[in-house]
């Protein structure tokens, strides 16, 4: 399995420092509102795609569609202090180490400068502004460290003027991010890949657990459709409710063998509680079958109880679980409090609150 052993975050959004150790195949993050759960998933995505200069803006767009401009990248910096570099580091399961640092800076652009001065009277004033986001990253393996840099720049009008890809680096891993916003998900790419590999039946089999009438899934014009017993035509998933759409998005991404890492924000969104246990079983089974690592956030107590029930019935998955309560403590800042299956089981049996610890 390719993936993460640990993750360390410094100065990213509201997280000054957070270290998460002993990551496993399926990792669930709990916590109160604004504890940093979603930020953890964003950091995992960024460090997996650290050579992609478009990724930071895409991450912001997923979080809030109205904050997808270059200027909004400042929200990734602590308290909008652009002089403090966010850093994300990790040790991977293949014993390589990764480090990514984000930096806002000014890079002189001859073309933009010429356009700005065209037809104007030259002055001695230097007009500069932060126009470039640099993604400086390192890969260390067997004592050898390699450094790379990607960047994206804008002109005076705020439009992207240049992008620089890291030379000599090719990312071998792929992460799929499933946001809390139900409207943002589309399983088309995953289903197309599964169709090419003749593995689409894996998804149909799991969809039958959600609704036993489902007998097919198809992609037409980038839209997902399902076939159902007793109905003569395919039905658009988007017209069948949030529950099926959410379930299909997660199952298709989990089944796609090209995705090494699955990131699911607020897994319970759009789903009726009766589907939770079936979905947990699908996630663990597909992660094992396709050898991938999964990261999930939730604030639903019912979701945790159904997870416990599923693991009671499927003991083969118990060792694969890690549960982390993320807490911004008064004395120690952000902390990750870890539990394994035994801790989850005990908490559910004794009605112990896991989603937030007041310290």
Regions found by a protein language model. Name each.
Residues 1-49, 60-65:
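Pre-Walker A-like glycine/lysine-rich segment at the N-terminus of P-loop NTPase domains
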Residues 50-257, 261, 322, 327-359:
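Phosphate-coordinating catalytic segments in nucleotide- and nucleic-acid-processing enzymes
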Residues 258-260, 291-295:
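Loop/turn-to-beta-strand initiation segments
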Residues 265-267:
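Walker B catalytic acidic pair
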Residues 279-283:
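Conserved hydrophobic alpha-helix in the ABC-type ATPase nucleotide-binding domain
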Residues 297-299:
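H-loop/switch region of ABC-family ATPase nucleotide-binding domains
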């Amino acid at each position: 399995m390719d993936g993460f052993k640990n993750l360390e975050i410094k100065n990213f959004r509201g997280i000054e420092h957070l270290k998460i150790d002993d990551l496993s195949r399926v990792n669930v993050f709990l916590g109160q509102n604004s504890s940093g759960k979603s930020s953890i998933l964003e950091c995992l995505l960024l460090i997996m795609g650290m050579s992609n200069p478009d990724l930071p803006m895409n991450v912001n767009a997923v979080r809030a569609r109205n904050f997808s401009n270059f200027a909004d990248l400042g929200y990734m910096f602590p308290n909008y202090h652009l002089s403090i570099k966010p850093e994300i580091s990790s040790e991977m399961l293949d014993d390589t180490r990764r480090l990514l640092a984000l930096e806002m800076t000014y890079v002189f652009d001859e073309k933009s400068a010429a356009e700005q001065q065209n037809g104007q009277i030259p002055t001695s004033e230097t007009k500069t502004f932060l126009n470039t986001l640099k993604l400086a990253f390192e890969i260390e393996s067997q004592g050898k460290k390699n450094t790379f840099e990607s960047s994206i720049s804008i002109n005076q009008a705020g439009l992207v003027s240049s992008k620089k890809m890291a030379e000599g680096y090719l990312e071998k891993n792929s992460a799929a991010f499933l946001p809390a916003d139900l409207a943002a998900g589309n399983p088309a790419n995953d289903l197309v890949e599964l169709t090419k590999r003749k593995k689409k039946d894996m998804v149909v089999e799991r969809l039958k657990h959600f609704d036993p009438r489902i007998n097919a899934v198809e992609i037409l014009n980038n839209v997902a459709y399902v076939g159902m017993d007793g109905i003569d035509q395919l039905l658009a998933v988007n017209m069948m409710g949030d529950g099926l759409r959410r379930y299909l998005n997660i199952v298709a991404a989990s089944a796609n063998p090209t995705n090494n890492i699955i990131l699911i924000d607020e897994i319970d969104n759009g789903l009726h509680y009766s589907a939770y246990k079936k979905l947990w079983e699908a996630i663990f089974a597909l992660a094992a079958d396709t050898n991938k690592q999964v990261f999930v956030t939730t604030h639903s107590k019912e979701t945790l109880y159904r997870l416990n029930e599923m693991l009671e019935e499927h003991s083969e998955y118990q060792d694969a679980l890690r549960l982390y309560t993320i807490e911004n403590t008064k004395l120690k800042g952000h902390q990750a409090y870890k539990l394994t299956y035994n801790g989850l089981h005990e908490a559910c049996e004794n009605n112990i609150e896991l989603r937030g610890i007041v310290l």
